[in-house]
Amino acid sequence: MILTLDPQVAGASGDMVLGALIAVGADPNRLEEVVHEVSSLGHEVDVHVHEIQKRGIRAVRVEVDAEGDLRDPDELREAVKTVAENVLEDRWRELPELALKYLLRAEERVHGDLCHLHELGSSDTVVDLVGTAALLEDLNPKASEVLPPNVGSGTVETEHGRLPVPAPAVVEVLSEWDVGIVREGEGELLTPTGAALLRTIDELLPDPPPPYRVKRQGFGAGTKDLPDRPNVLRALICEPGGSGEHVRIVETSVDDVDGEAVGELIEAVLQLEGVHDVEVLHGFGKKGRPRFVIRVVTEDRPGIEREVFRELFRWTGTLGARVYRCTRVTADRRIVDVDGIRVKVSRFEDVHHAKPEWEDVRRKVDRESAPLTRARLVGDLRKRYEGDGEDGAGD
């Protein structure tokens, strides 16, 4: 699954990100879990999720009501860390902590110190950051794309007086992030929290491989009613299009490991989330020694190479591995059931193939004592689904 966030029309805020993720299918109960954990720390927080219209666009509005301040940076860090540890799996805990890092760094650069928070300082910040990670964990996208955000224009009234848009804290969050901006509409459209969440999502999830297909869309609503546009953040759920996918390859060579250890290694690596395949090649290394080249193909996810190398080192003692990113071409595929036999039907451009599961064929022939041989049955199934793509090979 690929997640695209489109803040080009009306920018983004923390509550708009939450609403957009719920609108495309994230379970709002995950947000309730976050609110419960924040409340258990002694902060009164409540959340309301409902559907509204923004200039004719149906959108999800998330309202977070929070009482009490978190003006101390260390207290805010500890609250985010504690809530994240209680509701998130390890993989997603980095997101709220990194987003908070960008926010606190922006505060420090703008105001000169971090003794007292100015732009932040409420428990709803914890809900925005950890809640976004919880909803993403529920959706579980493998890649993301964040389009250039609309920052707005003009000036905005703050506790420090009237400031230009984008506000200084927003500019600091956007700095060093390789993204363009849009400047349309009056007023502040991109908040510091919205900017931090967009940046963190963009940086932590890999870019999607082109091409891809849009499956559904949803909108998260902002608070204000804008005079010239719907105040919404759009989210898109997409799927790879079938002709280009990025993968990572982790590869090492060993000449002092026996075949039994390699077999155990293969089994261990295939248990890791995101590993597609493991190949073992035979070759010759230094001084003519026989060696194994172990090649692991994984999804394109930052950090997965460390997970794979941990197992390579555990089972072989290898001192290093080569890691490279490449594109693989894949065919569209689906599984159909034909009289109890699973058939993998694949298509690339105008070429079709069908491959029955051999174990299903064997069981059917053995069980029914059919006069039809296994080879004949396989041939009949392939003939049905190959050729010109009729009888189910097409969409």
UniProtKB/Swiss-Prot annotation:
One function term, GO molecular function aspect = lyase activity
One Pfam family of this protein, by short name? Answer: Ni_insertion
Note the superkingdom of the native organism. Answer: Archaea
Q: Which InterPro entries match?
A: Ni_insertion
Swiss-Prot/TrEMBL keywords: Nickel
Which family is this sequence assigned to?
Belongs to the LarC family.
Protein name, entry field? Putative nickel insertion protein
What is the species listed in this Swiss-Prot or TrEMBL entry?
Methanopyrus kandleri (strain AV19 / DSM 6324 / JCM 9639 / NBRC 100938)
